[in-house]
Amino acid sequence: MAAEPLTELEESIETVVTTFFTFARQEGRKDSLSVNEFKELVTQQLPHLLKDVGSLDEKMKSLDVNQDSELKFNEYWRLIGELAKEIRKKKDLKIRKK
């Protein structure tokens, strides 16, 4: 019996998780993003959403709750949450203008 295909939302969540681990495995620890891995992920995968962030080093520091110079998945998830909130705000403004 074939598994049912994932919904669009399920695929999106899977992509968020897979992207983290794809970049986390490039150097050092395989379960966290180094500074270089974080910068590469942002540059390649989030160039439009984080184009106005200023310093990526400062952004990483703000996400790195335990200040170990690595982003664990839960710290990376904070970034995803921040981006989702910004997208929601923009969509909300568009709706209000109509």
Curated annotation (Swiss-Prot):
One of its GO terms (biological process) is positive regulation of cytokine production. The keyword Secreted applies. Plays a role in the export of proteins that lack a signal peptide and are secreted by an alternative pathway. Binds two calcium ions per subunit. Binds one copper ion. Binding of one copper ion does not interfere with calcium binding. Required for the copper-dependent stress-induced export of IL1A and FGF1. The calcium-free protein binds to lipid vesicles containing phosphatidylserine, but not to vesicles containing phosphatidylcholine. Ca(2+) 2 binds at residues 64, 66, 68, 70, 75. Ca(2+) 1 binds at residues 32, 37. Expressed in heart and skeletal muscle. InterPro entries: EF-hand-dom_pair, S100_Ca-bd_sub. It comes from the Eukaryota. CDD domains: S-100A13. Coiled coil: none annotated. Homodimer. Part of a copper-dependent multiprotein complex containing S100A13, FGF1 and SYT1. Interacts with FGF1 and SYT1. Interacts with IL1A. GO terms for molecular function: calcium ion binding; calcium-dependent protein binding; copper ion binding; fibroblast growth factor binding; lipid binding; protein homodimerization activity; RAGE receptor binding; zinc ion binding. This is Protein S100-A13. Keywords: Calcium, Copper, Cytoplasm, Lipid-binding, Metal-binding, Phosphoprotein, Protein transport, Repeat, Secreted, Transport. Pfam families: S_100. The modification Phosphoserine is found at residue 32. Residues 18-53 form the EF-hand domain. It is found in: Cytoplasm; Secreted. One of its GO terms (cellular component) is plasma membrane.
